Amino acid sequence: MDRATIEPAIKLLLNEIHTRLTEATRIAKAAEACALAGSSAEGVSVSMDIEQLIYEADRLQGAAALLNRLSGG
């Protein structure tokens, strides 16, 4: 596949990974704040949203890696 065609797609995928992991970081900080304030159960509840974001970031990473391999990178 043509690298010039794939490059913008890879950049978009990496941006989406960054977006999801930034959101996961925000949620993790909120969960930690709950735990530090004495509410570990609430912290765990808040942190449950992280799982989906990490799953999505992993799938996006797989797609970016595949495109990179297909382009000979």
Go through each PLM region and give its residues.
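Short, charge-rich amphipathic interface segments used for partner binding and complex assembly
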Residues: 30-70
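N-terminal acidic leader/helix
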Residues: 1-34, 66
